[in-house]
Amino acid sequence: MLTGPRLLDWSESPLISMYFAVEDWADKPNIDAALWCLWPTSLNQNANIVDKVEGHYIPSFEDDELQGYTVDSLRQNTRLELFPVATIATRNNARIQAQMGTFTIHHNKKIAIEDVGDHSHVAKYIIPHASKEALAEELKLLGMTRFSLFPELASVGAILKDMMK
């Protein structure tokens, strides 16, 4: 049963997703990581969000299809339980742009993404703990760093702190 946040972050970039999967390699050296892949239109079919014309439609936060997922709607319709949906946001801030961010929104129905429907909308790849450090170093060579994904001033401080260790 899901007890976590209603809004989950995803990225359109597999490299960015891999960064987040292995970034804690030093803090959790003996724990395997996981890389999750989501097929958003397949997930949305479970919530009956389908565009028969476009076929691969993903709603944005402002679209009518997501009105039932607003905080006000959830408060007013406590007995209504809808499946999670994949959505896109306006990329109007540097972090969402840098991370190529997308989201899934959970409704009152407490269900993990991987437990929705026939499970064909998601895949989980296990990254052995012994591979996490090497993958993190390779991603750094490709420009996947904390600052490139969190382009705020606070990231500079965190990077300098790490360099001083």
For each feature predicted by the language model, list its residue ranges:
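Catalytic-core elements of nucleic-acid end-processing and repair enzymes
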Residues: 1-165
